[in-house]
Amino acid sequence: MSPVPVSLAELTARHRDGIVGYLVRLLGDRQEAEDACQDAFLRAHQAFARLGPEANSRAWLYRIATRSGLNAARRRSRRTARAADVDLDSLPAAAGLSPERREELLAIRRAVERLPPRQRAALMLRQFEGFGYAEIAVALGGSEQGARANVYQAIKKLRATLGGARRRDAKR
């Protein structure tokens, strides 16, 4: 549990980069993630006085960021389907990869983007942010059992989707 920081400025300095990274993975777009992060910190500023001394400030802030990210994803899904628009060249980690590996990464990215928003958020918090299930529960506003179920279902769906793609490729 993170102690409540002396100020929102301390909380921002401590967690901003991590939240932006989480939102980039959640949303797949840096500018959209920056906007959602800004919205999250604005909302955190408005609610900071209500943060209790025993509260897990990290999970509290990620809960606000998750809501901002999910709201942004809903707005985007109303406008367009983005999975086909992913440009791996824009990702620094994609430089120098073989065409086959790039296709694998693109398939993974598309499969993750197709997950229901809560499952995607739970998976990102667990796998990339290192959250425990109790922290995920706080961040998503649910129970620890619900957090476990969301991560489990996300992994199960990814395995089914990606396993099916591998079987199809093997038959070619």
Feature map (PLM): residue ranges:
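Sigma70-family region 2
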Residues: 2, 39-56, 75-77, 161
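A short pre-motif secondary-structure segment
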Residues: 122-126
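Structural recognition of an alpha-helix C-terminal capping motif at a helix-to-coil junction
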Residues: 35-42, 55-67
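DNA-recognition helix of helix-turn-helix
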Residues: 66, 70, 140-164
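A short, charge-rich alpha-helical start-of-domain segment used by transcription regulators
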Residues: 1-21, 31-37, 45
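Short, Lys/Arg-enriched C-terminal cap helix and immediately downstream tail that follows
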Residues: 74, 115, 155-172
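Arg/Lys-rich amphipathic alpha helix in sigma70-family domain 2
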Residues: 52-53, 63-84, 101, 164-166
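Internal acidic/polar
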Residues: 2, 79-105, 109, 132
